[in-house]
Amino acid sequence: MSAILSADDLNDFISPGVACIKPIESLPSKQPQKSDNPYEVTTEDKVQAENPTPAQISLTDCLACSGCVTSAEAVLISLQSHTEVLNTLDAHPELRLIQNEQGTSLDPRSAQDDEGRIFVASVSPQVRASLAATYGVSEKEATSIIHQLLSGPHGLRAGGKHGSGFTWVIDTNIMREAVLVLTADEVSDTLASEAKDPSLPKKPIVSSACPGWVCYAEKTHPFILPHLSKLKSPQALAGTLLKSTLSKTLGVPVSRIWHLAVMPCFDKKLEASREELTDVTWNPADGQMFSQPQTPVRDVDCVITTRELLTLASARGISLPSILSKSSSVSFPSFPDKALDDYLFSKRSLSAQSMMTGTSGGYLHHVLTSFQARNPGSEIVAERGRNADVVVYKLVSPENGSIIEAARYYGFRNIQNLVNKLKPPEMSKLSGARRNDALGGKARMQLSSRKAAAKTKFDYAYVEVMACPGGCTNGGGQIRIEDAREANLTAQTGTPADTNGAASKPSPHEQRAWLARVDEAYFSAGDSEDETEASSKHFSILEREAGIHQILHYWSDLMGVPLSKLAYTTFREVESDVGKPQEGVNATAQAALREGTNW
């Protein structure tokens, strides 16, 4: 779905229509009165209407609408972009920090400036892989390029009104590891409760880290929502941890901490705008250092994609390959809390990425390996589904047989099959009855037998779902092969490439080869010597999970907020306004207005 979300090649955008919650109203244009005949009367049918102005649709409008998912998301491209990043850096000076034996603290002189901000960023591993494939560098070198751009002296800090840059840049892999551990706990608790605990998702638990999939489920298939994992995504969890701990330890309001996320997917812009992912959900009511209750502050202020990262550098006249050779690696100040500093900037990974973990974070793989560690002697067996984006896994024990079953579904073509399997029996009967009316008796019997067989085979404990075919390395915001060619040509010549020329469109074979190159960079992320040395001490998966639990509980104790409010979120059905009385539509508009729309 996300692969087509750009201003250049969007081909399914639906303009506001008669049933839109925000219709366009046109009034008759005023006709100049003729001085020679002041008594002339013009009938209404002869008055030409004014050309309607373009509809102004805000992010909240998208969340309140149940129309086409991709049409709503297309609006986000202009709302969160490299321009917002540059405008924010130019509008606010960077708050200065002091480092001494006591640790990192805020410079009192800098704190007097109400316009000052602390800028932090989080970057996904898929972004680094795409950048590495583009410039033919290692994943480690791609990481250095991003650090130099966002925080180095030759990057964003070299220009702008205030010379502002990002104080810390963290790897979302760190937060992914926390989500992996909590996911295994969630699956284990759900299986143990046998659907008796309403606070837990229903079996099968379906991953909720992909915002495109979540938005689709909320708007079109609300019966999926009880199955969705209640955990925040790594992006959202990073935002919560950074803003909560920096606000607490440095004594600054949450509103003065600005968090940028660099992601492979346009849908992450929509996720960052969810009202559930603001400081209101985790802030103590009596907190004096936090934002006011009536002004929710997003955990993630802005999301840009990998392609937009190139545009960000280009807008400041920065050549990404050249800044790699200009200076050494960026040194970030110590995080204000020692325990969290050790965690956020640790080089030891919970699990290395491989073909088995997939390209989307390895949620399913960690669930399997976690259960395998609790069942010594068990074995993971994989079986390919109807295509490469569907894989079924079983954890089997020689003594007890099958322990758990799980599956991976990537791409909306396969997601449709998953949705049909998750439909409640009543809905399946209703939809099936309508289809069967058009079929003959033999065809109906064959269809019923196939559906019955599918139902009997569907007994998964966990399903990893991603909207993009091939997973997150193929996200819609990733650098395409034609973008890579243009970026390299620009780097070689020093001038922007001519995009008006007749550039050849890459063939399907070239596109597959390009994606394989990005995947290779993604899987090579843990091969560097530094990380190998840091991981030389062997830790079992259960020991590493215990370490993650320890740091999460430490964070909860530091904030005085239960982990259920810090690491978990909620989802809700988005109801359609089509056919509702106008009062209902106005209520939606008023609710959106309260959330800060441009209406």
From Swiss-Prot:
GO biological process entries: iron-sulfur cluster assembly
Gene3D superfamilies cross-referenced by the UniProt entry: 3.40.50.1780, Fe-only Hydrogenase (Larger Subunit), Chain L, domain 3
Gene Ontology molecular function terms on file: 4 iron, 4 sulfur cluster binding; iron-sulfur cluster binding; metal ion binding
UniProt keyword annotation of Transferase present: no
Residues that, per the record, bind [4Fe-4S] cluster 2: 210, 265, 468, 472
Keywords, alphabetical: 4Fe-4S, Iron, Iron-sulfur, Metal-binding
Entry binding sites for [4Fe-4S] cluster 1: 20, 62, 65, 68
Family: Belongs to the NARF family.
Function: Component of the cytosolic Fe/S protein assembly machinery. Required for maturation of extramitochondrial Fe/S proteins. May play a role in the transfer of pre-assembled Fe/S clusters to target apoproteins.
Protein name (Swiss-Prot/TrEMBL): Cytosolic Fe-S cluster assembly factor nar1
Organism, scientific name: Aspergillus terreus (strain NIH 2624 / FGSC A1156)
Gene for this chain: nar1
